[in-house]
Amino acid sequence: MKKVRLKELESRLQQVDGFEKPKLLLEQYPTRPHIAACMLYTIHNTYDDIENKVVADLGCGCGVLSIGTAMLGAGLCVGFDIDEDALEIFNRNAEEFELTNIDMVQCDVCLLSNRMSKSFDTVIMNPPFGTKNNKGTDMAFLKTALEMARTAVYSLHKSSTREHVQKKAAEWKIKIDIIAELRYDLPASYKFHKKKSVDIEVDLIRFSF
């Protein structure tokens, strides 16, 4: 198995460029390097669901999770996002790191599932939390991810929605494991944010069949 230290992975992910002008409507918050590194390190070392696997990253934004996945030896990682500007930055990032096991597709993630059913070993994502104007987006992303994955889906969800997520998983007859509880340091990206940054508690959840 490809050996990468957590600190080393985090410091490499710190070099990934983020959103230049985040779009509120798309709930664009960057996945911080610390969170991305913890998430990918756990998936790689505990479950071996990255190396030589075909991985999808839904709502990939500027590509921090995809790039980390490619660094950890994925056979191929494909990032999906609706936002052309974010994918342009993603493309620059991939070129900067000279990664060849990575690709990106511009599309509406919620319309993907029929075309991509069971096409990926693993799906990873930090979906929109479904607050503000996008209620239920997190669950729509999750439903799509579960249709695309053959083995497992790894996703970040606000800890405050844990019961709701567990209920949905039971309804869909999906196995659910909360594999880490993390503090998501949300930077003040938008004008209406009063504080410099806010800590949100999030669960890293593994969904499997």
From Swiss-Prot:
GO molecular function, one term: rRNA (adenine-N6-)-methyltransferase activity
Subcellular location: Nucleus; Presynapse; Postsynapse
A biological process from GO: stem cell differentiation
Keyword Methyltransferase: yes
Lineage of source species: Eukaryota, Metazoa, Chordata, Craniata, Vertebrata
Activity control note: rRNA N6-adenosine-methyltransferase activity is inhibited by zinc.
Protein role: Catalytic subunit of a heterodimer with TRMT112, which specifically methylates the 6th position of adenine in position 1832 of 18S rRNA. N6-methylation of adenine(1832) in 18S rRNA resides in the decoding center of 18S rRNA and is required for translation and embryonic stem cells (ESCs) pluripotency and differentiation.
Chief location category: nucleus
Species: Homo sapiens
Record disease entry: Intellectual developmental disorder, autosomal recessive 72: A form of intellectual disability, a disorder characterized by significantly below average general intellectual functioning associated with impairments in adaptive behavior and manifested during the developmental period. MRT72 patients manifest moderate to severe intellectual disability, microcephaly, and dysmorphic facial features.
EC number(s) stated in the UniProt entry for this protein: 2.1.1.-
Tissue specificity annotation: Expressed from very early development (8 post-conceptual weeks) and expression persists through adulthood in multiple substructures of the brain, including the cerebellar cortex, hippocampus, and striatum.
Catalytic activity of the protein: adenosine(1832) in 18S rRNA + S-adenosyl-L-methionine = N(6)-methyladenosine(1832) in 18S rRNA + S-adenosyl-L-homocysteine + H(+)
Name of the protein described by the UniProt record: rRNA N(6)-adenosine-methyltransferase METTL5
PANTHER family documented for this protein: RRNA N6-ADENOSINE-METHYLTRANSFERASE METTL5
GO CC aspect terms: cell projection; cytosol; fibrillar center; nucleolus; nucleus; postsynapse; presynapse
Annotated Gene3D superfamilies: Vaccinia Virus protein VP39 (3.40.50.150)
Keyword annotations: Cell projection, Intellectual disability, Methyltransferase, Nucleus, S-adenosyl-L-methionine, Synapse, Transferase
Family, similarity comment: Belongs to the methyltransferase superfamily. PrmA family.
Residue positions binding S-adenosyl-L-methionine: 28, 31, 59, 62, 64, 81, 108-109
Name of the gene encoding the protein in the UniProt record: METTL5
Assembly with partners or alone: Heterodimer; heterodimerizes with TRMT112.
Positions of disulphide bridges: none
Pfam families from the UniProt entry: MTS
EC top class, as a word: transferase
